[in-house]
Amino acid sequence: MTNIRKSHPLMKILNNAFIDLPAPSNISSWWNFGSLLGICLILQILTGLFLAMHYSSDTTTAFSSVAHICRDVNYGWIIRYMHANGASMFFICLYMHVGRGMYYGSYTFLETWNIGVILLFTVMATAFMGYVLPWGQMSFWGATVITNLLSAIPYIGTNLVEWIWGGFSVDKATLTRFFAFHFILPFIIAALAMVHLLFLHETGSNNPTGISSDTDKIPFHPYYTIKDILGALLLILALMLLVLFTPDLLGDPDNYTPANPLNTPPHIKPEWYFLFAYAILRSVPNKLGGVLALVLSILILILMPLLHTSKQRSMMFRPFSQCLFWILVANLLTLTWIGGQPVEHPYITIGQLASITYFLLILVLMPTASMIENNLLKW
C-alpha cells in the first residue's frame, strides 16, 4: 500500500512542494526568505482579520475604533502592533529576497521573477492602503499626496484621481474602498504566491554558485524544514522584540493626531519601506517625470534578465559585479535616509545624485562590469 502522503490528491501536492521536493544541497540562509514571506503573509492575514472585526471604516469613527482596539479589546494592542510591525518585517524580508535574486541571478527564471515583481507591486499597494486606515494625519495626507500623483497622467489624470477618491477629495468613500481593497488584496497575494511557487518548482531552486544542481539534490524535509523553522523563530523573535519594547519605533508620531483636511503636517512622508522610492519621486522637479521615475524604480526589476550580460549566472565569482551590487545597496540606504529628510539643501542634491546613481548602476554600470568580467575570463 502506498503512503497516503503520496497517493491522496491534496496531500500529493503538499508532499511534492514541501516534503519530497528535491532541493540543492548548498543553498544558504539567503534562501530562507521565501518561507519567511509566507509566514509574514499568514501572520498579516490573521492579525488583520481580528483587527477588521473591531475596525470601523467610516471617517468619523475610524481613528476612534483603532484607539478602541488598543485600549478596550482583549489583547487588541498586541494584535494592532503585530500587524503594523509585521508589515515592516514583511518588507525587510521582501527586499532581502529580491536582493538575493539579483545577487545570485535568480531572475533567469523568467516566469518566477515576473510574478515576483507583480507580487512586490501588489504588496506595496496593500501596505499603502493599510497605512491610510487608522485615519491619522499622515494617513490622510499620505493618501492625498500619493493618489494625487495620478493627476500627472495626461488627459485622463484628473478624472482618474476623482474616480479613485469617489469625490473631490480624500473622504469617506476613499476610506471605505481602501478598507475593502486592503482586505481583499492579501488573498490575491496568497494566490499569486502559489503561482510563484508553481513556476519555481518547474525549474527547481537556484543555488549560490549559479551552476545546475541536478546532480546533487537532497529532500526538502527534514533538511530545509528545520532550517526554515529556525529562520521563522528568529523572525518572530525580531518581530516580538519590536512589538513588545518599541512598537512605535517605525511609525510616525503625526499619525496619533486625527486626520484634519485643514491642517497639513510640516513633513509628509510614507512609512520607512517606501522612502527610497519617495526620494526618487521628489528628486525629479517635474510632476510627470517624478511619477515615471517612481514607477520605473521598481519596474526596472522586470529588465534584470535583459540586462544580464555575464557568462556566469551568479555574482559569487564576479568581484566587480559584487562591488557594484553592494554600492547599489548603500545607494538604496542613502535614498531611504533622504526620503525621510525635509526638502532643503543639501538633501535635494544628495537625493538627485543618489537617484541618478541608482538607475546608472542598474542600467549601465552592472551590465558593463559583467562584460569586462567576461573578457577577463579569456586571460
Curated annotation (Swiss-Prot):
GO MF term list: metal ion binding; ubiquinol-cytochrome-c reductase activity
Residues reported in the UniProt entry to bind heme b b562: H83, H182
CDD domains: cytochrome_b_C, Cytochrome_b_N
Cofactor note: Binds 2 heme b groups non-covalently.
Cofactor dependency: heme b
Keywords: Electron transport, Heme, Iron, Membrane, Metal-binding, Mitochondrion, Mitochondrion inner membrane, Respiratory chain, Transmembrane, Transmembrane helix, Transport, Ubiquinone
Transmembrane segments: 33-53, 77-98, 113-133, 178-198, 226-246, 288-308, 320-340, 347-367
PROSITE patterns documented for this protein: CYTB_CTER (PS51003), CYTB_NTER (PS51002)
Membrane topology: Multi-pass membrane protein
Highest taxon, organism lineage: Eukaryota
GO annotation (BP), single: mitochondrial electron transport, ubiquinol to cytochrome c
One term under GO cellular component: respiratory chain complex III
Chain residues that bind heme b b566: H97, H196
Protein location: Mitochondrion inner membrane
Keyword ATP-binding tagged: no
UniProt keyword annotation of Heme present: yes
UniProt: a ubiquinone binding residues: H201
Other known facts: Heme 1 (or BL or b562) is low-potential and absorbs at about 562 nm, and heme 2 (or BH or b566) is high-potential and absorbs at about 566 nm.
Functional summary from the UniProt entry: Component of the ubiquinol-cytochrome c reductase complex (complex III or cytochrome b-c1 complex) that is part of the mitochondrial respiratory chain. The b-c1 complex mediates electron transfer from ubiquinol to cytochrome c. Contributes to the generation of a proton gradient across the mitochondrial membrane that is then used for ATP synthesis.
Similarity field: Belongs to the cytochrome b family.
Oligomeric form and interacting partners: The cytochrome bc1 complex contains 11 subunits: 3 respiratory subunits (MT-CYB, CYC1 and UQCRFS1), 2 core proteins (UQCRC1 and UQCRC2) and 6 low-molecular weight proteins (UQCRH/QCR6, UQCRB/QCR7, UQCRQ/QCR8, UQCR10/QCR9, UQCR11/QCR10 and a cleavage product of UQCRFS1). This cytochrome bc1 complex then forms a dimer.
UniProt name for this protein: Cytochrome b
Primary gene name: MT-CYB
